[in-house]
Amino acid sequence: MQFKKWIIALPLAVGLLGGCSLLEPLVYRIDIAQGNYVEQEAVDKLRFGMTKQQVQFVMGSPMLVESGYPNTWYYIYHFTHGHEKSIQKNLIVHFDDNGNLTNMEGDFPMSDSFFEKL
């Protein structure tokens, strides 16, 4: 008698608990956007020698400025669309000691006119 209860209870418990993972994709998840949305158009406006104020006007406030490295700004954008894989885009902007733009790196290509005079 005790054995029959286990034969019924065990598959029932496994089926109910396993059903949670099968229904998870059906649960609605909101889209989550975090950080600085960076467009290639804005990156194309950056020029060698721009001041920090000019870069901030074009790109907006950086997501991160490390206290030990104030001449390196990080623009980070992270987007999660429901159950799909997350997307992350990074742009790192470097300034010299005078606060002028010297280099940039990340997921956005530098424009051909980056080294042209302002």
From Swiss-Prot:
Entry annotated with the keyword Transmembrane: no
Lipid linkage positions (N-palmitoyl cysteine): C20
UniProt signal peptide: 1-19
Matching InterPro entries: BamE (IPR026592), BamE-like (IPR037873), BamE_dom (IPR007450)
S-diacylglycerol cysteine-type lipidated residues: C20
Main location: membrane
GO biological process, one term: Gram-negative-bacterium-type cell outer membrane assembly
Keywords associated with the record: Cell outer membrane, Lipoprotein, Membrane, Palmitate, Signal
GO cellular component, one term: Bam protein complex
One MF annotation (Gene Ontology) recorded for this entry: protein-macromolecule adaptor activity
Membrane topology classification: Lipid-anchor
Subcellular localization: Cell outer membrane
Family note: Belongs to the BamE family.
Job description of the protein: Part of the outer membrane protein assembly complex, which is involved in assembly and insertion of beta-barrel proteins into the outer membrane.
Protein known as: Outer membrane protein assembly factor BamE
Taxonomic lineage from the root: Bacteria, Pseudomonadati, Pseudomonadota, Gammaproteobacteria, Vibrionales
